[in-house]
Design a protein with these regions (language model features):
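N-terminal Lys/Arg-rich, disordered targeting/topogenic segments
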Residues: 1-6
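Solvent-exposed, non-transmembrane regions of membrane-associated and secreted proteins
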Residues: 10-208
Length: 208
């Protein structure tokens, strides 16, 4: 009986040890996978809007067949790339804010709006893993720069304010007198179904 109990304790100990390793490395592996996936998406998106030596834009039809059937097929609904140098952030923007969209990138809450003209709301998950998705969004401060690259142009926005609202206060997405970028994520991080939203608003400063 004692032998069986000892074996059971050892088995339980092994299980707990394995679980410990799983939780220790899971977040790191998840971040590595997401980073690799984003690199592929960004590379594919930029190939659509890049310029050849002759100065003409490279069209999707000119990209290799293997790319069109692989990476480029993942770009359905892609609107551009959001870069935030201050927090080492770079992800692809997709139409909509469904769970599927937010699982692979940043969601454009109202796809009918135009970047550089309207107040464009971009939603992202607040991951608990450092540096993943909008995890570090709360670090942004006044005058920090956000960049959105589309196939048509590159837009630079300057952060003008950060604040917290209730998740029902959708007025933050209303158009203003000037083009805005409004980043939206849950807060605080790590809380299940939080009622508050962290908002970062930035004004357009350049378009090229």
């Amino acid at each position: 009986m004692r032998k069986e109990e000892a074996e059971l304790r050892r088995a339980i100990g092994v299980v707990f040890l394995l679980l410990g390793f799983f939780f220790l490395f899971h977040s790191k592996l998840e971040k590595l996978f997401l980073d690799h996936h984003q690199e592929e998406l960004i590379e594919a998106f930029e190939s659509l809007g890049s310029t050849s030596a002759s100065g003409q834009a490279i069209l999707a039809s000119e990209v290799q067949i293997s790319d069109r059937e692989g990476k480029l097929s993942l770009l359905d609904g892609a609107r551009g790339i959001l870069r935030i140098p201050e927090i080492d952030f770079e992800m692809v923007i997709f139409d909509g804010a469904s769970e599927d969209v937010l699982g692979k990138g940043i969601g454009m809450i109202e796809p009918h709006k135009e970047i550089g003209i309207n107040n464009v709301g971009l939603a992202g998950h607040r991951s608990t893993t450092f540096g993943k998705q909008f995890n570090r969004l709360d670090e942004l401060e006044h005058h920090d720069i956000l960049e959105v690259k589309t196939e048509e142009a590159t837009y630079e926005f300057e952060v003008v304010k950060t604040f917290i609202v209730d998740r029902t206060e959708v007025e933050v997405l209303e158009d203003a007198n000037a083009p805005l970028l409004t980043l939206v994520t849950c807060t605080p991080a790590g809380v299940k179904d939080p009622t508050d939203r962290l908002i970062v608003q930035a004004k357009l400063i350049t378009e090229r």
